[in-house]
Design a protein with these regions (language model features):
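Terminal domain-initiation and capping elements
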Residues: 1-74
């Protein structure tokens, strides 16, 4: 099972990350807010989705278009 990891860096604002989670992964606002809180202060990032590699690859491309740092682990 593949994993998509969000790396929280100071370049991105919380509203930008929340908007990306909603756009790229169809998150609801409360879930997006919870992920942002979890990601704060974690150097390794936080897993935002697990599943099919192709689905996560497409989501990662969406995040890259928005200049948000993610990592896909196959």
């Amino acid at each position: 099972m593949s994993k998509l990891i969000l790396h929280n860096d100071d370049v991105n604002s919380t509203t930008k990350i929340a908007s990306a989670l909603i756009k790229c992964l169809d998150y609801e606002l409360p879930a997006a807010t919870q992920i942002i809180i979890l990601a704060e202060g974690r150097k390794k990032g936080v897993i935002i989705k697990e599943g099919d590699f192709i689905e996560l690859f497409m989501a990662q491309n969406c995040f890259e278009e928005l200049n948000i740092n993610t990592e896909l682990i196959a």
